[in-house]
Every structure is written in structure tokens, then in C-alpha cells.
A protein has these predicted regions:
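RNA pseudouridine synthases
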Residues: 1-234
Length: 234
């Protein structure tokens, strides 16, 4: 008998449809806005546990399932999340993330078109834990950490502007904070200056792609997550 909860048919099929890649070492998943990757103070079930239940049920595994979290996405963000299915794969992926050899791109629907259309942003950021918010400060000192990203304007819809972002550092709320600082808050992101919320409570920031060398097979892996259905016209 499984140590995990039993998923109903609808949930099982939904989870299966959102697996972008899987082998004996890794599972790459398309997260929706509102889902959490790892357990937090809300007590809501994280994807790491839901996917353990999924694998246990699909593979009829009676014992424990390993599902290691290699990186996180904020709750209101959608897109690619990579889990490790063995401790060896987790250790190697963690090292690759630390070394900067995992390349991720994000798509953001912004409330204004950036000018210039492409740039490298370098700022100093601090984090306010109580507010769960990051701020840009004038320079180094105290708790400030350097934050770097590259952005490129892609195209516009009737009201919003699609921007591709490559993160060069991994600071708290970095994309949200830096884009807001140049006058381009992300659609739905009230915390960083968007005028209105999204109906689903998420923000229009999407982890679009990931590129890395497989930690065991040593082959290059490139994956993309489809944009949410709510991104009409993008």
C-alpha cells in the first residue's frame, strides 16, 4: 500500500499532461501560478509532495519516492520547474545551479514597453523579510546584493508588452523588482506597481525555457513550457 495519498483520475491526468521531460534521474514539470514548489508556512501541499504521490501511483511503488527540489519559482509565477529523482542527480543539479551552468529564460508581460528595447540591468537589491518584498538601493553596503539580468523586448499585444529575461543572478523577486524599477511592472503584480491584479491571483511572469547538460547522461537538454492559456494574444 502506498504511503502517499491517492489522486483522482482528473488530477492524475492533469499532472501527467504537464510533465515536460522525465527519465530515471530528473522530472521537469510545468507549474501553474498559485502552486508552490516546496512546503511553506501556509501548509498547502507543494508540488514536490504531489509529484511523489503521482509517481507512486503511476509506477505502483509501495515505498518512498524521492523528489528533490533543485530550484524554486515564486507562488504567483508559472513555468518550468526541475526536480531530481535521485540524491545523486539532486547533488549534481544543485552544483550546476550554483556554478551558473543552468540557463533559464523567463517571459514577462509588462504594463509598459521598455526603453531601450534590450539592455543589461545591474542594480543593488535588499530584501525586507517582513514585507516579503525587495528594493533597489543606490549601491553596495549593508545587506545589499548585486542583481543582474538581460532583457529583450519581443512584441506587444493591445495593452501589454512581452519581454524575455535572462537571469544572471538569483535574487529574491529579482525580475519583478528590476523591471518595475525601469517603469515596466509585470501584469498582475500589485506588490511592484501593477495597477490591477490577475483573475487567478498570479502574475504574468513565466519560466519559459531551461537549458543544461544532463547530470548523468551528459547530453544537452533544452525544454520550453507553454505559456498559460490566460495569456491571450501572446
Amino acid at each position: 500500500m502506498s504511503v502517499y495519498r491517492t489522486l483522482d483520475e482528473g488530477e492524475f491526468r492533469d499532472l501527467a499532461s504537464r510533465i515536460l521531460y522525465e527519465d530515471n534521474h530528473l522530472l521537469v514539470f510545468s507549474k501553474r501560478a498559485g502552486e508552490i514548489v516546496q512546503g511553506d508556512k501556509t501548509g498547502d501541499e507543494p508540488l514536490s509532495e504531489t509529484l511523489k504521490a503521482f509517481v507512486a501511483q503511476r509506477d505502483a511503488k509501495p515505498g518512498q519516492v524521492f523528489m528533490g527540489v533543485t530550484h524554486r519559482l515564486d507562488r504567483p509565477v508559472s513555468g518550468i520547474v526541475l526536480f531530481a529523482k535521485t540524491s545523486k542527480a539532486l547533488e549534481r543539479m544543485n552544483a550546476m545551479f550554483r556554478e551558473g551552468s543552468v540557463h533559464k529564460t523567463y517571459w514577462a508581460l509588462c504594463c509598459a514597453k521598455p526603453s531601450p528595447e534590450s539592455a543589461l540591468l545591474t542594480d543593488w537589491m535588499t530584501r525586507n523579510e517582513k514585507m516579503n518584498k525587495s528594493f533597489i538601493v543606490k549601491g553596495p553596503g549593508g545587506e545589499a546584493k548585486e542583481a543582474k539580468l538581460k532583457y529583450t523586448y519581443l512584441r506587444s499585444t493591445e495593452r501589454y508588452h512581452l519581454v524575455e529575461v535572462e537571469l544572471l543572478t538569483g535574487r529574491h523577486h529579482q525580475i519583478r523588482c528590476q523591471l518595475a524599477h525601469i517603469g515596466c511592472p509585470i501584469k498582475g503584480d500589485l506588490k511592484y506597481g501593477a495597477p490591477r491584479s490577475n483573475p487567478d491571483g498570479g502574475i504574468s511572469l513565466h519560466a519559459r525555457s531551461i537549458r543544461f547538460v544532463h547530470p548523468v547522461k551528459k547530453t544537452e537538454v533544452f525544454l520550453e513550457a507553454p505559456v498559460p492559456t490566460s495569456w491571450k494574444g501572446v
